[in-house]
Amino acid sequence: MDGVSNWPAPSTPTPVHATLTIPGSKSQTNRALVLAALATPQGTSTISGALRSRDTDLMIGALQTLGFDVESAGTDSDLRVGGGLGPAAGARVDCGLAGTVLRFLPPVAALSTETVEFDGDEQARARPIAPLLAGLQALGVRIDGDGLPFRVRGEGSVAGGTVEIDASASSQFVSGLMLSGALFRDGLTIVHTGESVPSAPHVAMTVSMLRDAGVEVDDTKTNRWTVRPGPVAARHWTIEPDLSNAVPFLSAGVVSGGAVRITGWPAVSTQPAGAIMAILEKVGAVVRQTESYLEVQGTRQYQGFDVDLHDVGELTPAVAALAAVATPGAVSRLRGVAHLRGHETDRLAALSAEINGLGGQCEETDDGLVITAAPLHGGVWHSYADHRMAMAGAIVGLRTPGVEIEDIATTAKTLPEFPQMWADMLAGQTATDPEAGA
C-alpha cells in the first residue's frame, strides 16, 4: 500500500506474562449510540466506557450528520447524546468501513424528513447491504440504489409491519432493522428466510440492549423477531471491555507458554465470552475466571483443533493464527465461516494467502479453513485494511522472527492503542527468537 510503512512484529522466545485492561466493546458502543439517539424524544442519554476508535467515531459523526448531539462528558469514553433527528438538506453519511454504520443507520434515516446519502470507503462498496435495503423498501421506504452509494428518502415515518429478509450474509441486517423498529408506526416483525444467521450472539446482544431501553421484543420463535411499537427509553449505558479485542492478547499467552490476565472481564455478558474461553481451552490453555478478571495460561506446544466459528466469525483471524503456529504437523479445521468472504476483506482468502506466504499450509474449504502447522519464516503479512488481519499477524509474529505487518494502523478501526498495548505487554521480553518455528 503506497505511503504505508511496515511494522516489525515483535517475537519472543520466553513466556509472556502480562495484565491488561481492554477498551470498550465496539458492538455495545455503537448499539448504545443508536439507541441513545432514538431515545432523544424521551431525554438525554449518557454512555460510560465507550470505545473511541474509527468505527465508533464514524458512528458518532454519522449521528451528528443526522442531527443528533453527541459530545464528550468529561472524558473521551464518556458520552452524552441529545438533540434530535433532523438531518440538513443534502446530508451525507460516511460509513467508512464500519458495517454497523452502514446497516444500523439507514432505518434511522428513513424516519427523517430529508433525503440522506450513504457512502463509504471503496472496500465498503463490496460489503453486503442489498437485503437490508430491500427490506426497508418492502416496508415502504423509498431508496435509490441497492449498494453504496445509495440514498434513503425519508418521509417522516415508517409504517412497519412484517418483512422477510435473508440475513445469512450478516446478522447486522436483523440488528439494524430491530434497533429502529420500535419507532415504526406498527412496530416490526422480521422473518429470516435464508440459511442460518451468522454471529447470532450479536443479534442476542441487540435484543438484550433493546429490552434494557424498555423496548418489548419477542424472539421466542426461531428466525423471527417482533419489536413492539413504543418509545425507546433514555438511560445510562455502561460499556463492557471488548472481549473480541482481548483475544489476540490472550493468544499471546497461549503461543508463548505464558499467562495473560484481562481485567474487568464480565461475569455475564452478551458478548461471546463463553465461546472465547472454550476455543482457548481447545488449544490446551488453562482458563481461569474470577469476578474481576480472566486469565489464560498457555503451553507453547499444542495440537490442532476443530472448531465451529459460525457464531463468532470475528475471532477467525486470531484462531487461524493460533492454528498456524501450533506444533508442526498439527491439523486444525475452522468451520462455519463462509460469511467471512463478505467482511472487511475476504478473510478466508486473505488468511490463506498470508499463512502460505510465510511458509505455512492453509487451504480454503466451502465454509472455512484447514490449517496444517508448519515452521514459518519471516516476511510481510498484509492487513488488507482489516483490523483483525493485522492483529492475527502480530500473533504469528510472536513465534516467527522477521514478520512485518503492513498497515498496522488499520487496527484503529476498533483498537487504536493496539501497537502500544502489544509493546507494553511484551515489555522486558527478548525481541528475537532464534528457535522460532522449531
Curated annotation (Swiss-Prot):
NCBIfam families, sorted: aroA
Function as written in the Swiss-Prot or TrEMBL entry: Catalyzes the transfer of the enolpyruvyl moiety of phosphoenolpyruvate (PEP) to the 5-hydroxyl of shikimate-3-phosphate (S3P) to produce enolpyruvyl shikimate-3-phosphate and inorganic phosphate.
Catalyzed chemical reaction(s): 3-phosphoshikimate + phosphoenolpyruvate = 5-O-(1-carboxyvinyl)-3-phosphoshikimate + phosphate
Residues reported to bind phosphoenolpyruvate: K26, G99, R127, Q172, R347, R388, K413
Top-level taxon of origin: Bacteria
Biological source species: Mycobacterium sp. (strain KMS)
GO CC, one annotated term: cytoplasm
Class of the enzyme per the UniProt entry, highest EC level: transferase
Matches recorded under InterPro entries: Enolpyruvate_Tfrase_dom, Enolpyruvate_Tfrase_sf, EPSP_synthase, EPSP_synthase_CS, RNA3'P_cycl/enolpyr_Trfase_a/b
Gene: aroA
A family per Pfam: EPSP_synthase
Binding site for 3-phosphoshikimate: K26, S27, R31, S170, S171, Q172, S199, E314, H343
Identification of the protein by name: 3-phosphoshikimate 1-carboxyvinyltransferase
